[in-house]
C-alpha cells in the first residue's frame, strides 16, 4: 500500500507529502514547486536523474537503486512485514535520522535532535506537545 497527501489552494495543488523531507533534501529552487504540484506517478520521469545525481554526491552505495526506493515519494506499508522505516513508521522512529543514514550510506547517522516527549501507553499514544 502506498499513500501520500496533497494540499490545494484555489483548485491548484500547491504541496504534497509522502516520506518526510524528500522534497526538502532533493529538490532546489523551482524544482520544489514542480515537485509539490506533481503526481507521484511521474516522480521517476520528472526527478529520477536529479535524485540519482544527489545520491551519488552523498556517497550512496547504489544511487540508482536507492532512488527507485525513494521514488515515487509515497509512504509505503506492507502488512506482511513489520512496521518501521521504510515500511510505515513507529512512534519512536526518528525518520530524519533514518533517512540521513540511508542516503549518505552511513556518513551521517543523525541530526542531533532527539525526542523530547514520553509516549503514552494508551490512545492517543503521543506525549504532551511542546
Residue ranges and their predicted role:
Residues 1-130:
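Surface-exposed extracytoplasmic segments
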Amino acid at each position: 500500500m502506498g499513500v501520500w497527501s496533497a494540499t490545494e489552494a484555489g483548485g491548484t495543488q500547491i504541496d504534497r507529502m509522502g516520506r518526510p523531507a524528500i522534497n526538502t533534501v532533493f529538490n532546489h529552487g523551482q524544482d520544489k514547486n514542480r515537485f509539490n504540484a506533481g503526481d507521484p506517478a511521474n516522480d521517476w520521469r520528472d526527478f529520477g536523474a536529479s535524485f540519482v545525481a544527489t545520491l551519488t554526491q552523498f556517497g550512496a552505495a547504489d544511487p540508482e537503486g536507492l532512488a527507485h526506493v525513494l521514488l515515487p515519494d509515497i509512504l509505503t506499508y506492507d502488512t506482511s512485514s513489520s512496521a518501521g522505516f521504510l515500511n510505515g513508521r513507529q512512534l519512536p522512529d526518528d525518520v530524519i535520522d533514518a533517512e540521513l543514514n540511508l542516503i549518505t550510506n552511513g556518513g551521517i547517522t543523525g541530526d542531533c535532535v532527539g525526542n523530547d516527549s514520553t509516549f503514552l501507553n494508551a490512545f492517543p499514544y503521543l506525549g504532551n506537545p511542546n
